[in-house]
Amino acid sequence: MAERVLTRVHRLRERVDATLCAHRNEILLFLSRIESHGKGILKPHELLAEFDAIRQDDKDKLNEHAFEELLKSTQEAIVLPPWVALAIRLRPGVWEYVRVNVNALVVEELSVPEYLQFKEELVDGASNGNFVLELDFEPFTASFPKPTLTKSIGNGVEFLNRHLSAKMFHDKESMAPLLEFLRAHHYKGKTMMLNDRIHNSNTLQNVLRKAEEYLIMLPPETPFFEFEHKFQEIGLEKGWGDTAERVLEMVCMLLDLLEAPDSCTLEKFLGRIPMVFNVVILSPHGYFAQENVLGYPDTGGQVVYILDQVPALEREMLKRIKEQGLDIIPRILIVTRLLPDAVGTTCGQRLEKVYGTEHSHILRVPFGTEKGIVRKWISRFEVWPYMETFIEDVAKEISAELQAKPDLIIGNYSEGNLAASLLAHKLGVTQCTIAHALEKTKYPDSDIYWKKFDEKYHFSSQFTADLIAMNHTDFIITSTFQEIAGSKDTVGQYESHMAFTMPGLYRVVHGINVFDPKFNIVSPGADINLYFPYSESEKRLTAFHPEIDELLYSDVENDEHLCVLKDRTKPILFTMARLDRVKNLTGLVEWYAKNPRLRGLVNLVVVGGDRRKESKDLEEQAEMKKMYELIETHNLNGQFRWISSQMNRVRNGELYRYIADTKGAFVQPAFYEAFGLTVVEAMTCGLPTFATNHGGPAEIIVHGKSGFHIDPYHGEQAADLLADFFEKCKKEPSHWETISTGGLKRIQEKYTWQIYSERLLTLAAVYGFWKHVSKLDRLEIRRYLEMFYALKYRKMAEAVPLAAE
């Protein structure tokens, strides 16, 4: 392995060397242009712009050695005259580093620590000390199996199953972990699967053969209780199935595994073992409630995701428990923060049943300090000093509520994942991580220049919490491949944590490996009760139409809607999101305002921000100010409608369909979107959708077939693409239908909550088994994380100011 990497590095250096030797003048001219920018960081588009600026014949000479291709793979250039260092991404998850002395035209290869040390000179100069704390998780995972192909990224469970089936069942001794695993299954004192009559693998195989012979003779629908006592006598307990047919399937699967193991059978068998009865889902920040909260600060897609996830998850748990022949009632607890100042929501209520479920609740636990309970909302960027005490309180609350340990803990976002890590560590429970969004990719250079951001965002605490959580967890769920490893041209959210530096704090030389089999892509869907095609007229919620009509077309301007639409015959271009910088709603308004063709074709309706009350969120305040300026500067009144955030999800579903009735379209213009739940919602309603090509929507939409990609950094082109679409629809009305139908088909194939919940519970089973068989291997990394948490993270969190009451 080491030899292959070394060879690749030399080839890369030799490639640059060859270009230098063959075309010294041309390369000197180009590098001089780069160097002339002075000390700093150049991004890919800046490097390519400089390359485009040189003469065509010089470009042609350099391209004899594929120099432009090399530049396209370069994610950043560090300029410290006379040196220029390049971070070159050969493919997702595979990086190399070189630097060139512009004066001497000498090329040097750099290791990860050398490159990061060079980069730190941008901040610290050359005096960054002889010893810097380096964080390196690679030694702890070196012995773990990992795939090497890009296509394997995000399919961790498939790789793990192949590895386990090959390694765990090759002789009698290797079957011992499975035997121990099956014997370890208990629930509140009740034994499941195997009892103490089965001592070794030989006994197990003999018992399974006897069971097979017996079950074959029974009618398939025979209930388990009719032969329960007979099975107990030979060592088999409840959990194999509810009927003779299902029990026989399980017995045969295990016999097949012991005889000739294969990955598909292993996954199916593990997925049917009774393992998950109590689930805790952590989502502390924002206003977490089921009504009247969407659009509040830090309250958006993540809340919707969890409230859609939980009913589907409960349904799948109930189905599996029944088919396992058990009479256990599952519980799901969504643990969030209790807000005494609940501002008209249920966020001050300790326990709240989740709509559409029987056994799932929101459990709220307050943040506390030595002075008592914290009453007011706190930004997600300022929660860090409260988390440790919060988790101590949460552990007591869930123990009292469940009367048992949870079987699976799911974290959401940075602080939820840190909380999940602390709780899973304390209880010894399988942990699942869902990032939703890793902030480091949203704010360019927020690692190297962390001090500029820290007073407002406290990224030093957040990035550290992210590193701890992603390395502590048993498995990670992402909605898209891009979330893990980006695309050919863009770096993935997790990939950006492979190597980075925060000067003065620590240097990450190996933070995460995107090839790690803990990564799995499991995409969510939209709630089919709320979001369904506009064409399903019998299901349409027409009672909302007068309200929606007033919302869109009323001549009244007030706190809920500003500006009016004069021409009701035009289609509506629609967007709905939080009003913050990254969501880029004001960017969309500016594109529209500056494109006369688009303004002539459609009305623009923006739902975002809450003008009904004064915002406490600084970003929202800035975006509101910008929106007012755009309306006035470009005289948008008459073609534009700005509606305050809408919190009624049922009505919002009909709003999408109402927009579809106008033959309009939905736009998601974010600078970055981890997944894009509103994209899925709009497409599920049959609304043609245009969405950012930075993040998840690039995978959800197949460009030109089920929607369109737009580049938020090139607003003029995005506006032209929108105008082209509506012009074509005007000439060919069937074009609108084609894109609408393409979007619906895409959703039905890939983005449903049923597929999601089945996959999640199977992952919990497989990684629960992996956790059992590799517990000794995981101990070292957990000790390392304990030390890093205690000595580094805790001090950073304590430095975050407590909120003023």
UniProtKB/Swiss-Prot annotation:
GO molecular function, one term: sucrose synthase activity
One GO BP annotation of this record: sucrose metabolic process
Enzyme class: transferase
The keyword Mitochondrion is annotated on this UniProt entry: no
Residue ranges of the region described as GT-B glycosyltransferase: 275-752
Reaction(s) catalysed by this chain's protein: an NDP-alpha-D-glucose + D-fructose = a ribonucleoside 5'-diphosphate + sucrose + H(+)
Gene3D superfamilies (alphabetical): 1.20.120.1230, 3.10.450.330, Glycogen Phosphorylase B
The enzyme's E.C. designation: 2.4.1.13
SUPFAM superfamilies for the chain: UDP-Glycosyltransferase/glycogen phosphorylase
Keywords: Glycosyltransferase, Transferase
Keyword Glycosyltransferase: yes
Functional note: Sucrose-cleaving enzyme that provides UDP-glucose and fructose for various metabolic pathways.
Protein family: Belongs to the glycosyltransferase 1 family. Plant sucrose synthase subfamily.
Annotated protein name in UniProt: Sucrose synthase
Species: Solanum lycopersicum
